[in-house]
């Protein structure tokens, strides 16, 4: 009997934990992320690691930027992870640990560390994960794992987003060291950055539309007040 979770099972679990509707453009983002994580987690070769967690957390936070209300955003993230039958607190904790690490060291050191050519105190267990990945021919690579690695580089050098040549060089070194498919990873990161820009533009357009609607409502409200005031004055004059 096959007990593997289906996409439908994952979605049901998600909506069990998060019962409120998801706003407009963000709904598609969550649907795609939910399905992507499902397909990764049910794969027989899937194994959780903190770098994947960082990718999930980063992708969620970036694509959900500006979401309101904030408490719903937290609920959506928790349900996203619970839908995969995993612990959202572990994802957040492991992601923060890597972010804190990257915030303390230089760009060259973080790259050397990821490439297994430099040791950093108290991070042996993380480097063991990377080494195991490099030696595992069945490692389940994913776009979210790639985003996690890229996020570490981005934290120490924000110019990587703008400087494609520099970004490509660093990512190629990582691919060679961890035995990852270079073409696939580079394409995934380029697509990720492109999607971030597209969502940011959609969010900006939505905010402009909402602002215009707000101004129209305020104008109509002011016109009603003026009309009412004018009517009252006319009535007083006739008396």
From Swiss-Prot:
GO terms for biological process: photosystem II assembly. Keywords: Coiled coil. It comes from the Bacteria. It holds the Pfam family ThylakoidFormat. GO terms for cellular component: plasma membrane-derived thylakoid photosystem II. The keyword Heme does not apply. The keyword Coiled coil applies. Residues 158-216 form a coiled coil. InterPro entries: Thf1. Residues 217-239 are annotated as: Disordered. Belongs to the THF1 family. May be involved in photosynthetic membrane biogenesis. This is Protein Thf1. The lineage of its organism: Bacteria, Bacillati, Cyanobacteriota, Cyanophyceae, Oscillatoriophycideae.
